[in-house]
């Protein structure tokens, strides 16, 4: 069979161990950010206008704005964005914000108001487009650029609006009684709490203020006492018959009761149930079936019941008893005397129905609506006298005014679900019925019906993403603006103004700026490597404005909840105070329009698992039985086992296969991206997996990235979605490649209006937020065909489009002379020599020349008192050359600052007079390299203020930039020409020409030869007979001219931007930024880790020949302590080691077969081996059909080690590992004989040797080591500052003092506490003594002692230091002198 498939070698092929086919595509990993913000901005207006959400809804909710008199109104018409002034790269370089100007069209309507009738008529309408500030745009990678730095807006988890029922778990009251409470939480507005107290009275609180009886709230809603009782209780009529009463028989209320006396049928007089019997449901049913209607009761049986209606004398209107009054010995005779023989009674039995609302009503002091409203007014605004109008207005504004109160669509949906209402989700305020339903449900809970809510359920927590956070912020800004507009509309002559004059957009712009600049949720992007970027964008934080605080959050909120499954990762969360408050979205999860997290499931129809995928939120999932992704299926897609493990309502259970309605999509749907990158995650302890996920985010991009032998199949997804590796936007042919850009001639999606050329700019040695190096390298060569989505270039930490955070190294698990005690790591010198763990870090230094009071600072080479040697790296302008190697103390930018005039001595005056003034009045403030940093200058940027003359260096940089832009333009022009003229000649070929250039014969049939006789620019002169073709020619011409002018225009704009001066902070004339690349080799003290939470510090780097070696003489690269495995239970690292060993063994075999093929030209053995390795899993590449060149490319990729993927929870088992080892011809134990490199002796026991993937973390000893002799002191205590950033000292703390005390080292101790710390006079003396060469000094009083004395005085204690006494005693010889 002919092998036809071609493989270009530009992606990594892996052998897949996964057995479960994935039916759903993993959603784009940064979709959370992009979709949310796009929905908010809605830059392109859809057909039919923008829907009422995002920015549109903000404007709609604030406008129209009417002035106080109602004589004019400002309406919102529409908004649009202009293109941003600077693109993403320019913003990064110039420290600007990437934003687009927002233009809003407003309409001002002026009315004429008839003074007599008050009727309005429109007098004037003016419409105008108004600039409303800049709106930050999101880059393609889901970040924002604010003042030149990349930031991420983290999504926030908060409690969903709606109604929640809960109890205090018996904590409030000593009896341990459960006090139930309900809380209505709106999206914005006042909270309403309804709660029981220990006496079972129901109270309401508004905004957590003083409580009022709930009946007052109901009265304020317009109900009276009788109506309240009839709403909450049923009524039954007791009729007088003879000397007793006839009471209706109700089986429901009697359930479970015990009879005290005999039950007698009121109609027949027979005893139906004897006294002292329990009324079982069965017995009651029998009585009902017999036709029992009513029972006989005595007067005593009525005592303790409550009246349902007022008992009124209708003639006189006298009220004998009110509704809710209790019937007892005193009241019953009153009723009988008044001649009532029918009594309406409330259906309260104290068992199924409690008298809570009735008791509340009787305890409530307010009698009517007015009292209730006044009471509420006093609670909300204490100290103000209420009037009926103000009280009514205040009460209405609390819950029933859409301006002040908003449940939001989510809140309304949740409320409908919880209270079984059916209200449209456009009703965003509370209604009377809602409040009644809440109180009813609460009373039912107290009566033992229904369940309380679990607030940690993901159905009750929702996510606010960027768009929504931004919307709230912008709304605040507009509301601030609204007040100003109203005032201005009232104070200004409205007939003469335009909308522009009324609006000051500052508050809105300030709100946006404040949100991006200083909100807790707007964070500096974690940019150590591509994984940390993606994780940061998928983070969910419970902190932030309107969220929890670390201190308040209890254990429950932080804990893993069953609803997290497939929505929030149970593994990835920080260690420390934020644990459980900051989470990560699971791989397949997405956020729905209401902000709830959804997870995908496969539908099961008639017992067969379909590929139909359904996204469900936690609330919707509760009613289903969900099987796991690894449940065994037969060929038809039915479950093999009779009982299947499944999840239902938060429990894991075995259920019959017919009950199961859904199945998970993939085994990795429950973990986050970082956790899904850990192979053999299922064999690691959860705590270590957590460390593993967190440490992968800190892996520094290495000089040479290398993809792991043992991956999980998630690597390409992360590399692609993070934007580190560049994917092709559309298919085409590579036209040009160099280190800085790739030019592709498109062959698909050829839209006439768009350019037919895609230029991809590569980032070269840029600095990331964490000072790591961002560098992209092209993978394609000229002439390659690419398809949409193909990887064109590798970025930091990517290798052939796979995420590559570390390196594969040969590991041995064994002790080695104690150098791997306590998780230390022993390395071979080969690792340093071959730059295995070398990384590049880029430091940015900036210097500003300001205009000071004494004159301007100057950036110059002419610095006083500095030798020529120190200036050797500076150019004429005083700025360091690119490529200069710099070390601590070297000058990067020379700068001088004017010094204050000091009075001159006569000698100075004489010298001045003779030599003219110079050097004396300036001081050297040059920027120098900080201590401990060595590197190479890779880039210099010079920024000048408008109108400041540019120096030579700035001009040179500008020239280079313009040349680069011109080259881009010329290349694009060339490709455009080639493309267009190619199409033109295709169109002309075979046509009959009617006209042409000079000397052309009409009627000639055109061919390539004929056309080529003329220069290209004259080809447009040909006109052809065929009208259709002629039309196409003209269209092509128009399009070509338009593209050309567009290209030129773009070039001119960019040149203009380059030449224009820069925006500078006030007082700054010039700014220089110098970027220095620092090469960091691995060294003792650096922190390293594997992917399984196995972290350690490099303790020693040993010569290669001293490292243990294998029988074939290969030395291991790294030695780890075997004791790090058992107690930590992260066995995944051992399995990874074995599998890596097998991969390397297979790679060796493939390498030998390549050599054999080169010798004999027979490719079959190679093809067979590769075929055998890849196997035929559901995700395997079709290697079988590769052509010979492709097989060789793949073999070349695999000769160092075969790449495999073992997905989480669906990876290689023990049998697979053994099979791989056998295939590689290695021992199935995975252990080898090792020899000691120093003595050459064999070690007694076999040692586990293999390849493990190690990462170098961003905790490098070079950044941490620090020393100080003199430096800054704290202002108050006069002690040295702390920390490397402040150039501080080392803290000699309490315990260290004890140590010196224990040694009896009195003088050392005295020195530590005085002259080396805060004895101000003493330390100056010591300095002077050292300078003189003396070694005598005296310690004085530490400043902190004085601080203590002052603090005690501030407490009102008179503390005196009686120093004189000590001196006197010493003088009198009663105290010994200090020892010499």
UniProtKB/Swiss-Prot annotation:
One GO biological process term: DNA-templated transcription
This protein's record includes keyword Cytoplasm: no
GO function term, MF aspect, one: ribonucleoside binding
Keyword Ligase on entry: no
Keyword field: DNA-directed RNA polymerase, Nucleotidyltransferase, Transcription, Transferase
Annotated InterPro entries: DNA-dir_RNA_pol_bsu_ext_1_sf (IPR042107), DNA-dir_RNA_pol_bsu_external_1 (IPR019462), DNA-dir_RNA_pol_su2 (IPR015712), DNA-dir_RNAP_su2_dom (IPR007120), DNA-dir_RNAP_su2_hyb_sf (IPR037033), RNA_pol_bsu_bac (IPR010243), RNA_pol_bsu_CS (IPR007121), RNA_pol_bsu_protrusion (IPR007644)
Family matches, as SUPFAM superfamilies: beta and beta-prime subunits of DNA dependent RNA-polymerase
Enzyme class: transferase
One Gene Ontology cellular component annotation held by this UniProt entry: DNA-directed RNA polymerase complex
Task performed by this protein: DNA-dependent RNA polymerase catalyzes the transcription of DNA into RNA using the four ribonucleoside triphosphates as substrates.
Classification via NCBIfam families: PRK00405.1 (NF001616), rpoB (TIGR02013)
Protein known as: DNA-directed RNA polymerase subunit beta
């Amino acid at each position: 069979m002919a092998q036809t498939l071609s493989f270009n070698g530009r992606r990594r092929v892996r052998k897949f161990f996964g057995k479960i086919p994935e039916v759903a595509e993993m959603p784009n990993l940064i979709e959370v950010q992009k979709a949310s913000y796009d929905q908010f901005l809605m830059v392109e207006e859809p057909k039919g206008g923008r829907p009422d959400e995002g920015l549109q809804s903000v404007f709609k909710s604030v406008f129209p704005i009417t002035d106080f008199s109602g004589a004019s109104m400002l309406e919102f018409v529409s908004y649009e964005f202009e293109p941003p002034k600077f693109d993403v790269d320019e913003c990064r370089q110039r420290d600007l914000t990437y934003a687009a100007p927002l233009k809003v069209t407003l309409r001002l309507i002026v009315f004429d108001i008839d003074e007599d009738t008050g009727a309005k008529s429109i007098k004037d309408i003016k419409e105008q487009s108004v600039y409303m500030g800049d709106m930050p745009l999101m880059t393609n990678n889901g970040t924002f650029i604010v003042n030149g730095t990349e930031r991420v807006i983290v999504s926030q988890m908060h409690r969903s609006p709606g109604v929640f029922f809960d109890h205090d778990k018996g904590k409030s009251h000593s009896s341990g009684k459960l006090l139930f409470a309900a809380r209505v939480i709106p999206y914005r507005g006042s909270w309403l709490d309804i709660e029981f107290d220990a006496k079972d009275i129901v109270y309401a609180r508004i905004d957590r203020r003083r409580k009022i009886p709930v009946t007052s709230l109901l009265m304020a809603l317009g109900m009276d006492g009788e109506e309240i009782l009839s709403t909450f209780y049923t009524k039954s009529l007791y009729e007088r018959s003879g000397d007793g009463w006839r009471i209706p028989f109700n089986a429901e209320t009697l359930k479970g009761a015990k009879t005290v006396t005999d039950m007698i049928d009121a109609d027949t007089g027979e005893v139906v149930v004897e006294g002292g019997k329990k009324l079982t449901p069965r017995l009651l049913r029998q009585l009902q079936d017999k036709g029992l209607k009513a029972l006989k009761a005595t007067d005593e049986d009525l005592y303790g019941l409550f009246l349902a209606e007022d008992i009124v004398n209708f003639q006189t209107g006298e009220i004998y008893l009110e509704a809710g009054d209790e019937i007892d010995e005193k009241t019953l005779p009153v009723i009988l005397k008044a001649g009532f023989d029918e009594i309406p009674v409330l259906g309260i039995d104290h068992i199924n129905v409690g008298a809570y609302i009735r008791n509340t009503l009787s305890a409530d002091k307010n009698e009517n609506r007015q009292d209730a409203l006044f009471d509420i007014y006093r609670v909300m605004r204490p100290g103000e006298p209420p009037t009926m109008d103000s009280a009514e207005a205040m009460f209405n504004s609390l819950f029933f005014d859409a301006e002040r109160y908003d449940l939001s669509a989510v809140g309304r949906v949740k409320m409908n679900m919880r209270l079984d209402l059916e209200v449209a989700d456009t009703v965003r305020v509370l209604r009377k019925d809602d409040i009644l339903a809440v109180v009813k449900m609460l009373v039912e809970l107290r009566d033992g019906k229904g369940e309380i809510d679990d607030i940690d359920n993901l159905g009750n927590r929702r996510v606010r993403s960027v768009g929504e956070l931004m919307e709230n912020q912008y709304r605040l800004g507009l509301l601030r603006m609204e007040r100003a507009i109203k005032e201005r509309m009232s104070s200004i002559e409205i007939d003469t103004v335009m909308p522009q004059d009324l609006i000051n957009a500052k508050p809105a712009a300030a709100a946006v700026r404040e949100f991006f600049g200083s909100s807790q949720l707007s964070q500096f992007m974690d940019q150590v490597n591509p994984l940390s970027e993606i994780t940061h964008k998928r983070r969910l934080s419970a902190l932030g404005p309107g969220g929890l605080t670390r201190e308040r959050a209890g254990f429950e909120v932080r804990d893993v909840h069953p609803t997290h499954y497939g929505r929030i990762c149970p593994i990835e969360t920080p260690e420390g105070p934020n644990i459980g408050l900051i989470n990560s979205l699971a791989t397949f999860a997405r956020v729905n329009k209401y902000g709830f997290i959804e997870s995908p499931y496969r539908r099961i129809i008639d017992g067969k698992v379909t590929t139909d995928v359904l996204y469900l939120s936690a609330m919707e999932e509760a009613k289903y039985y969900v099987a796991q992704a690894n449940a065994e299926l037969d060929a038809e897609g039915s479950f093999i086992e009779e009982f299947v493990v499944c999840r239902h309502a938060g429990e894991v259970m075995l259920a019959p296969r017919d009950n199961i309605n859904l199945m998970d999509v993939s085994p990795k749907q429950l973990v986050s991206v970082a956790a899904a990158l850990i192979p053999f995650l299922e064999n690691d302890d959860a705590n270590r997996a957590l460390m593993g996920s967190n440490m992968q985010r800190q892996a520094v991009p290495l000089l040479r990235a290398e993809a792991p032998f043992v991956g999980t199949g998630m690597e390409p997804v992360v590399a692609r979605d993070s934007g580190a590796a560049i994917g092709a936007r559309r298919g085409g042919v590579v036209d040009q490649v160099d280190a800085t850009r790739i030019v592709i001639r498109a062959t698909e999606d050829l839209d006439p209006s768009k350019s037919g050329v895609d230029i991809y700019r590569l980032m070269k040695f840029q600095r990331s937020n964490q000072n790591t190096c961002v560098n992209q390298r092209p993978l394609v060569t000229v002439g390659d065909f690419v398809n949409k989505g193909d990887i064109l270039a590798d970025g930091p930490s990517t290798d052939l489009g796979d995420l590559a955070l570390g390196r594969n190294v040969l590991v041995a698990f064994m002790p080695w002379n104690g150098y791997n005690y306590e998780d230390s790591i022993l390395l071979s010198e080969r690792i340093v020599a071959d730059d295995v763990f070398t990384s590049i870090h880029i430091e940015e230094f900036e210097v500003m020349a300001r205009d000071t009071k004494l004159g301007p600072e100057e950036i110059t080479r002419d610095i006083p008192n500095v030798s020529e040697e120190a200036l050797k790296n500076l150019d004429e302008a005083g700025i360091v050359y690119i490529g200069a190697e710099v070390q601590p103390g070297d000058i990067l930018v020379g700068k001088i600052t004017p010094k204050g005039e000091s009075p001159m001595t006569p000698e100075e005056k004489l010298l001045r007079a003779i030599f003219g003034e110079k050097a004396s009045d300036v001081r050297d403030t040059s920027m120098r390299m900080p201590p401990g940093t060595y590197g190479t200058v890779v880039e210099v940027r010079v920024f000048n203020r408008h109108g400041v003359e540019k120096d030579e260096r700035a001009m040179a940089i500008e020239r280079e930039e313009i040349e680069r832009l011109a080259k881009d333009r010329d290349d694009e022009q060339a490709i455009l020409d080639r493309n267009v003229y190619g199409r033109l000649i295709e169109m002309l070929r075979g046509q009959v020409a009617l006209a042409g250039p000079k000397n052309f014969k009409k009627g000639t049939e055109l061919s390539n030869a004929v056309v080529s006789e003329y220069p290209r620019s004259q080809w447009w002169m040909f006109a052809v007979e065929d009208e259709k073709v002629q039309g196409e020619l003209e269209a092509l011409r128009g399009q070509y001219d338009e593209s050309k002018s567009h290209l030129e225009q773009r070039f001119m704009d960019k040149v203009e931007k380059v030449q224009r001066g820069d925006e500078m902070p006030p007082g700054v004339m010039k700014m220089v930024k110098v970027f220095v690349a620092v090469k960091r080799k691995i060294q003792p003290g650096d922190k390293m880790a594997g992917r399984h939470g196995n972290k350690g510090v490099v303790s020693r780097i040993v010569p290669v020949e001293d490292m243990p070696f294998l029988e074939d003489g290969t030395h291991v690269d790294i030695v780890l302590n075997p004791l790090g495995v058992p107690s930590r239970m992260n066995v995944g690292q051992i399995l990874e080691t074995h599998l890596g060993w097998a991969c390397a063994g297979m790679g060796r075999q493939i390498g030998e077969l390549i050599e054999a093929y080169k010798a004999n030209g027979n490719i079959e053995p190679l093809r067979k081996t590769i075929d055998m390795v890849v196997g035929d899993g559901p995700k395997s590449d079709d290697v079988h059909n590769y052509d010979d060149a492709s097989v060789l490319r793949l073999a070349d990729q695999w000769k160092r080690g075969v790449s495999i993927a073992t997905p989480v929870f669906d990876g290689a088992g023990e049998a697979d590992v053994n099979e791989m080892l056998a295939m590689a011809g290695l021992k199935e134990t995975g252990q080898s004989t090792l020899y000691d490199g120093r003595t050459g002796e064999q070690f007694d026991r076999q040692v586990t040797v293999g390849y493990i993937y190690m990462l170098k973390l961003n905790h490098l000893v070079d950044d941490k080591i620090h020393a100080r002799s003199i430096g800054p002191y704290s202002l108050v205590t006069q002690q040295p500052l702390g920390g490397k950033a402040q150039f501080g000292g080392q803290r000699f703390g309490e315990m260290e003092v004890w140590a010196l005390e224990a040694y009896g080292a009195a003088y050392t101790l005295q020195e530590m506490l005085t002259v080396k710390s805060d004895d101000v006079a003493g330390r100056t003396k010591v300095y002077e003594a050292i300078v003189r060469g003396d070694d005598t000094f005296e310690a004085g009083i530490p400043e902190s002692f004085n601080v203590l004395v002052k603090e005690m005085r501030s407490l009102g204690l008179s503390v005196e230091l009686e120093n004189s006494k000590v001196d006197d005693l010493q003088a009198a010889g009663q105290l010994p002198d200090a020892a010499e």
